[in-house]
């Protein structure tokens, strides 16, 4: 091997060592001057520049228009709900006091604070990482051809990757806003849930006044102030509560009647029996002779169906016909 070839191989071996070395600044600082004083250092640089020129480096920054539109759509939604943009969350909460949007605005403020904290921490990490990469490229530029154009292109790629993470953070915040809307502001729901505290206050008053659960207008106004809701909502709540309470009591009564012992139940078909086909008031009308049986009571001075009050002979014949039905034929 010639002396020139040996020098080139030595130079390349030293370059390879840099890639395998650990981040020992002292060793790197000692190795850098040795590479630069090598007589073939400039020749290696020229070869690397020539090879780099053969690589097609597109200077056009291809923008993903669809991703950009989605990002703008997320920003618009977050600004409309006060999660992004000027911080007027406290003002919106004060304006929503006493309405059904009060708790919704409080939850939006939590989403805004979480998004701000995560974005701020991520931006700090991103800035630190970009500075580190730029410093590495600058140091490597002493030994391999790294142009300013290449550095800018690489930094733009890194910014694009970090922007994707920001997009995910915004998307997560938007999903939380959508869930809050479904929970608090969905107009398709038949009713809106009050807060746990408001429900406890209203239930406490209802149970304390169970015999007369009809609060006056003054009481409704006081309850509305305590629960941060409107007087109309208080009236609707008590109306619905009374209906549900009556239905519950009726259901419990039916279950108690069904769970009675067999000996306590009336026979099937008897007046008051659960499966009787005749109403109680007209059960006795099916057999007009039933009212002539001994012991049957009827209004004084009134004979049912214009019969006499009691005829023993007719009753004896009737009972005998029931006992011997074949003899009457």
From Swiss-Prot:
DNA-binding region listed in the record: 187-249
Gene Ontology CC annotations of this record: nucleus
Disordered: annotated segments: 248-275
Chain intervals for the UniProt region annotation (PBC-A): 10-90
Molecular functions per Gene Ontology: cis-regulatory region sequence-specific DNA binding; DNA-binding transcription factor activity, RNA polymerase II-specific
Entry annotated with the keyword Cytoplasm: no
Biological function: Plays a role in regulating gene expression in dopaminergic neurons, acting redundantly with homeobox protein ceh-20 in head neurons. May activate dopamine pathway genes in concert with ETS domain-containing protein ast-1, and homeobox proteins ceh-43 and ceh-20.
Family classification: Belongs to the TALE/PBX homeobox family.
Protein name: Homeobox protein ceh-40
Source organism per UniProt: Caenorhabditis elegans
Gene name per UniProt: ceh-40
